[in-house]
Amino acid sequence: MIYVDADACPVKPEVLKVAERHGVEVTLVANSGLRPSRDPMVHNVIVSGAFDAADDWIAERAGPGDIVITADVPLAGRCVRAGALVTGPTGRVFDEANIGMATA
């Protein structure tokens, strides 16, 4: 599964193309409206407007074998600790070796 912190993610279209090419499900998580997809492999989740609601939703589900795309460094840290592969929208990879420095 690919989880996308979708509220301010500039690469949603690219993520969807790559996921479709590889047959991987995508869940877009946001506090506000998302454009519906006809693709059964794409899931939209609208969370409450509460602070960090989208981050909490993703962090509670992401784990080994999942990919998380986010520019939110604290969320990246939570997901790395849960065993997910995490990258920012620019392609920056967050991992155990660099997440401590990124959150500092």
Task: Describe each PLM feature range.
Residues 1-104:
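Nuclease catalytic cores that cleave nucleic-acid phosphodiester bonds
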